[in-house]
């Protein structure tokens, strides 16, 4: 995109992150004692490793699927692993997930997420104010239903404006890295849709600097959510504070055309904070990060797989063309096509493609913190858990299970289509799975912005496939960078370039 700075998918590698974590352990002399824990009666099998603090982290981050499958064969579906200073009990049987997600009193997501927000975004009040927590989560309802329809209408207008002012003017082949292109595109559309327009005379410079600072912050994010003391993360803390200053209550109020959810968040935060409290900006940073951090890499992977699979691109373009013809819409110079949420949902091939992309690249985990010593009943077995430990469900094992998905490593755009409709029936061990793709979490931790994110991906893919010629340049296969393990959509482990130009329309 014009005006976009170079953005690579070069997130900190797992070994670099673990190296810094290991250095931090030198400051904590008692950490070695943590590895001396022994298994008590009725507790799950315990896998500690020999490295102080790190435990089994090196093997886990190198190849998490193989690591967990190996332990599953050795110890069964439930076991505890010592990882980076934490004891995490994995429950790998998908038919037992409900026993973890439906016990919020003893297995809490809220306290875990509040601590994460305190360190990653400097939102401290959520740790102690349950009323604020409830009000913040209640506001997320404005990302569903009719408010979501209004957001989609705004998004369409923002896409139209951005494409017509910049991208449609590119009539000769232009080469960019896919991740950089997707990052700039998703950032600008998302920010304008949610926060409105910056009215200052130097608005292009302001949004460009905010975008670049956000990308730097996001690259640092795995460090921020680690156990490394914030005092050792001076660059990360400095970037965090810089963005917070750009999103103060006063500066957000000066933006024109804010979405209803941003207005609601502004109003409710004023009830809990002074008008000039910097923590209001910290809340906005957390909300902005949640709106972008997984959509950008998901959009990258969607473009990457579609460009590498001509049959997918052809099927998607055929579906879009058929829809436009059925609704009397015509393609031509300028953005003239329009979609409602119901119409986007009706595009079965597009829905299947996005689900397949999320299945392949999502490594999110459902995490709960044990609030008290307890017994976790899993059908015929019961395990003792200790206060302060964590319980994790790991959906990538389902996503990559050959019993559930034939050839799970392959990209198949039509995997979720059956007889021209969405396929929703998948089995394991002869039993139907209630949920078979879980990129957005489960239960109380399910991403509230999932519909917004998927609709944005659908809309952008439609516009790119309709109005542009697209070709991949780097045809080498790439893999996943696992430095964001547990955090959602993984980044690629290397850069990939493509070229594009606006289609020429004959009158």
Swiss-Prot record:
Inhibited by drugs voriconazole and metyrapone. One of its GO terms (molecular function) is heme binding. The gene is Cyp7b1. GO terms for cellular component: endoplasmic reticulum membrane; intracellular membrane-bounded organelle. It comes from the Eukaryota. It comes from Mus musculus. This is Cytochrome P450 7B1. It is a multi-pass membrane protein. A cytochrome P450 monooxygenase involved in the metabolism of endogenous oxysterols and steroid hormones, including neurosteroids. Mechanistically, uses molecular oxygen inserting one oxygen atom into a substrate, and reducing the second into a water molecule, with two electrons provided by NADPH via cytochrome P450 reductase (CPR; NADPH-ferrihemoprotein reductase). Catalyzes the hydroxylation of carbon hydrogen bonds of steroids with a preference for 7-alpha position. Usually metabolizes steroids carrying a hydroxy group at position 3, functioning as a 3-hydroxy steroid 7-alpha hydroxylase.
